[in-house]
């Protein structure tokens, strides 16, 4: 069903989808039917009526207007002052309580009873330092700043979910925590939110990201590893500078660095399990300016990605060992920094199997016949600081919301100056996010689980 949907919309099937998507969707539909019956008997919220609410002209127009306002005034990491003000104004209009500031410009709102269980929904707010090239009415009005990763859509969808939840607050069997996070693009926003206590006592969290690889109306995820852990490294290799005509009188760091680059490739091809995907990529190689001078030192750097915490730590250790040892072969010293420029090390994003089953069933029920649900996406080597929430909360799940619209030319990947979101996707994200939280609370109450923490 997922592939048929993509073809019908003129979109090529995304390369990371498995061939058994049809089987998965059939299974999801059966689970959704079961969940719908249970939800009806329990009087819980959710279902296709939530999507109908989000797609009503007034509601959809409001969401589009919010996104356009955010898109026109993009703000970089931890500079989201106006975006945060807009979020708070919308929450005020809904009558939703919130806490601000959190992690600088972040906002933490709550809807429901104020008592456990607590389930969180997260969206990021920051833009990228790049010039928008899309010519449209709501193009960025700030030079060299652009929402090229869809965070304007994420923030809008979470506000849409907040409105749905607030309208149905008397049905909630617990508390939904809404996280409007700053600083995702620099990789430190989530950790600062955690350190500020934003997810204290939260037992489950859901996050999402728009994807131009999925057509509008399609959502997808997978259990287990979804996004890679990400690290960066920078090494300064130092030798002895001298005249290029007398290399014997020098200690050439360029030769040492060249062999380091080659040796690093062996970490994946000869040390990693072929069934465990890993990437080591050198992206920086900077040395002297004069063509007749052997420089004193050279700086190299790059990134590494892996899908397990164990593999991540092992690869990090081996990168440093190889750089130092290989440099020493050519009489050079090497210093390796894994935090250059304040870059964090991000763990892999690993989805709870139980929450993924919940996602599949709720998505099929909520989005109904108007959307395909993809349950077996391939892992992606991209990374997300949502993984930091995953380490702080007992259960977590991250998924993708399709925004591809070939008829409108909305096909450019994130971080492209031509990237643009299909506004028709906003109701899908808002409705699904709200339904995931409502159904989760319903399920937890029916389970009769213990709640040692009585307040968030």
Curated annotation (Swiss-Prot):
<dbReference type="Pfam" id="PF01546">
    <property type="entry name" value="Peptidase_M20"/>
</dbReference>
<dbReference type="InterPro" id="IPR011650">
    <property type="entry name" value="Peptidase_M20_dimer"/>
</dbReference>
<dbReference type="GO" id="GO:0010179">
    <property type="term" value="F:IAA-Ala conjugate hydrolase activity"/>
</dbReference>
<keyword id="KW-0378">Hydrolase</keyword>
<feature type="short sequence motif" description="Prevents secretion from ER">
    <location>
        <begin position="453"/>
        <end position="456"/>
    </location>
</feature>
<dbReference type="GO" id="GO:0009850">
    <property type="term" value="P:auxin metabolic process"/>
</dbReference>
<feature type="signal peptide">
    <location>
        <begin position="1"/>
        <end position="42"/>
    </location>
</feature>
<dbReference type="GO" id="GO:0005788">
    <property type="term" value="C:endoplasmic reticulum lumen"/>
</dbReference>
<dbReference type="Pfam" id="PF07687">
    <property type="entry name" value="M20_dimer"/>
</dbReference>
<dbReference type="InterPro" id="IPR044757">
    <property type="entry name" value="ILR1-like_Hyd"/>
</dbReference>
<keyword id="KW-0256">Endoplasmic reticulum</keyword>
<keyword id="KW-0732">Signal</keyword>
<dbReference type="InterPro" id="IPR036264">
    <property type="entry name" value="Bact_exopeptidase_dim_dom"/>
</dbReference>
<comment type="similarity">
    <text>Belongs to the peptidase M20 family.</text>
</comment>
<comment type="function">
    <text>Hydrolyzes certain amino acid conjugates of the plant growth regulator indole-3-acetic acid (IAA).</text>
</comment>
<dbReference type="InterPro" id="IPR017439">
    <property type="entry name" value="Amidohydrolase"/>
</dbReference>
<protein>
    <recommendedName>
        <fullName>IAA-amino acid hydrolase ILR1-like 2</fullName>
        <ecNumber>3.5.1.-</ecNumber>
    </recommendedName>
</protein>
<dbReference type="InterPro" id="IPR002933">
    <property type="entry name" value="Peptidase_M20"/>
</dbReference>
């Amino acid at each position: 069903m997922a592939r048929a949907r993509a073809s019908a919309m003129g979109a090529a099937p995304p390369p990371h989808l498995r061939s058994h998507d049809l089987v998965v969707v059939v299974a999801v539909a059966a689970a959704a039917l079961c969940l719908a019956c249970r939800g009806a008997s329990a009087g819980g919220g959710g279902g296709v009526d939530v999507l109908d609410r989000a797609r009503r002209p007034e509601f959809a127009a409001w969401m589009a207007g919010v996104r356009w306002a955010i898109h026109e005034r993009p703000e970089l990491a931890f500079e989201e002052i106006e975006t945060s003000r807009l979020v708070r104004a919308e929450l005020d209009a809904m009558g939703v309580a919130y806490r601000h500031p959190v992690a600088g410009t972040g906002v933490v709102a709550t809807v429901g009873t104020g008592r456990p269980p607590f389930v969180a929904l997260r969206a990021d707010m920051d833009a990228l330092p790049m010039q928008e090239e899309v010519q449209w009415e709501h193009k960025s009005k700030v030079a060299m700043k652009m929402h090229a990763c869809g965070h304007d859509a994420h923030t809008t969808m979470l506000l849409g979910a907040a409105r749905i939840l607030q309208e149905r607050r008397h049905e909630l069997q617990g508390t939904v925590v809404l996280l409007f996070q700053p600083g995702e693009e620099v990789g430190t926003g989530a950790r600062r939110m955690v350190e500020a206590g934003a997810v204290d006592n939260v037992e489950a969290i859901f996050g999402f990201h728009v994807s131009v690889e999925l057509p509008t109306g399609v959502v997808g995820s997978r259990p287990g590893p979804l996004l890679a852990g990400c690290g960066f490294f920078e090494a300064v290799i130092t030798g002895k500078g001298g005249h290029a005509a007398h290399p014997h009188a020098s200690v050439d760091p360029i030769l040492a660095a060249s062999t380091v680059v080659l040796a690093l490739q062996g970490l994946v091809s000869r040390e990693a399990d072929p069934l465990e995907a890993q990437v080591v990529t050198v992206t920086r190689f900077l040395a002297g300016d004069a063509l007749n001078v052997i420089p004193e030192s050279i700086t190299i750097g790059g990134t590494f990605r892996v899908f397990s915490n164990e593999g991540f730590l092992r690869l990090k250790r081996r990168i440093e060992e190889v750089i130092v040892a290989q440099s020493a072969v050519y009489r050079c010293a090497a210093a390796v920094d894994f935090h250059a420029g304040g870059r964090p090390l991000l763990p892999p994003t690993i989805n709870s199997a139980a929450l993924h089953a919940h996602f599949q069933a709720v998505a099929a029920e909520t989005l109904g016949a108007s959307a395909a649900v993809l349950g077996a996406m391939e892992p992606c080597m991209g990374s997300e600081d949502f993984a930091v929430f995953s380490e702080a909360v007992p259960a977590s799940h991250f998924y993708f919301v399709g925004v591809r619209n070939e008829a409108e030319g909305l096909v450019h990947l994130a971080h492209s100056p031509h990237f643009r979101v299909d506004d028709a996707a906003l109701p899908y994200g808002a409705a699904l996010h709200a339904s995931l939280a409502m159904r989760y609370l319903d399920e937890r109450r029916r389970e009769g689980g213990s709640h040692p923490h009585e307040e968030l």
